[in-house]
Amino acid sequence: MTNPANPSPTLRVLVLAPTRRAASETFVRANLRRLPCKIVAYFGDERPLLAPLRLSYGLAILCSKALTRLGALRLATLPSSLVAWGLIRRHRPDVLMVEFGFHAVRVMEAAAWSGVPLVVHFRGSDASAQGRIGVLRERYQRLMKLVAGVIVKSQPMRAALLGLGAPADHLIVSPSGADEQLFGAAGSPKNAPPIFVAVGRFVAKKGPLLTIEAFGRMLQDLPDPLGRQARLVMVGEGPLWGEAKDLIASLGLKAAVSLEGVRSHKEVAQLLRGARAFVQHSLVAADGDSEGSPVAVMEAQLSGLPVVATRHGGIPEVVVEGATGFLVEEGDIAEMAKAMGRLALDSALAGRLGAAARIRAKGQFTVQHHLAQVGTLLAQVVWERRDRSPGG
């Protein structure tokens, strides 16, 4: 049998995800809709009374969560794994792909019982030493003995999982990438007004409050009339939205900062095309939550914008300091303000960095690149499992 470079349209993939909200994320949706495979997906928050399998799966995940909260980590695996095993028998997939590592430990025994190769897609805090790894270390070590393949978003995530025994030859670093269908049209930061755009949930790891503070400090140093022209546009919502609104008021930035709430991809793409730069102050949150490689950063670069961000997670693998943007240390508001100020003052510099960012994104960080890597891994683990089987 020849090892295929790409997945066959007949390849059957059973996808298990914790919630439908997770599936609404751009990167998960791309996996479900664009992989050239036969995909069936189940979600842990479903409770459809007229679909017994989906109801059973949702209830099993609920039970596993409750047992996890009680500290019965080994027992927590059984309800979900039993139902997942039933799903495998029902759908007979060639490969099982589970979204998020913390969800994989709930269903991992089903892969062991069935012999179906298991591929796990880690995305952020689920592969953070400060986050869930600390709580689930023993379970993750068991998971790494069962997986046939692992997908992560950044080199720090790769290092963390290698330390737990992940198979190095089947562990790929594959940022989710930007969608060229949505963000393929380039803006012109050289000709744009000094508008800075931030896109992301208002949660601690995205650092929205620090971004606002850095913008406010930048305004203090900008000469007129540039200081009166500069704007910060923030897209998203979340638990820190109220604090962000209060901070804007306390800093006297109501005229310069706008909170746009949730916007469609089309609207975000339009905002990016009219901006000077993209900004994001990612950092490790107090609870250990952290980023992989933020999709919004790649979308901004594909749109031709320079990026001002932090040396956090996989961001330094995407943003090249001084070539496609500027990087600062987590929590360094002064340096972030200075980097933003450079782009506000020098539109030609913004244009050069943005052009380089677009070239780099098109060459390495698109959804198409990501799906090609994922598809190849899925095909590889299936081929290897069949090759080792008695009839292979």
List where the protein language model places each region:
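Short hydrophobic beta-strand element within catalytic cores of glycosyltransferases
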Residues: 297, 302, 306-309, 319
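Short His-centered aromatic/hydrophobic patch
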Residues: 98-104, 122
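Conserved donor-binding/catalytic core segment of Leloir-type glycosyltransferases
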Residues: 14, 187-217, 233
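Nucleotide-activated donor-binding/catalytic signature segment of Leloir-type glycosyltransferases, i.e.
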Residues: 243-266
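Carbohydrate-associated surface elements
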Residues: 156, 177
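Acidic donor-binding loop of glycosyltransferase active sites
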Residues: 273-288, 305
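N-terminal subdomain of nucleotide-sugar transferases
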Residues: 1-55
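Conserved acidic donor-binding segment of nucleotide-sugar-dependent glycosyltransferases
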Residues: 318-322, 326-333, 342-348
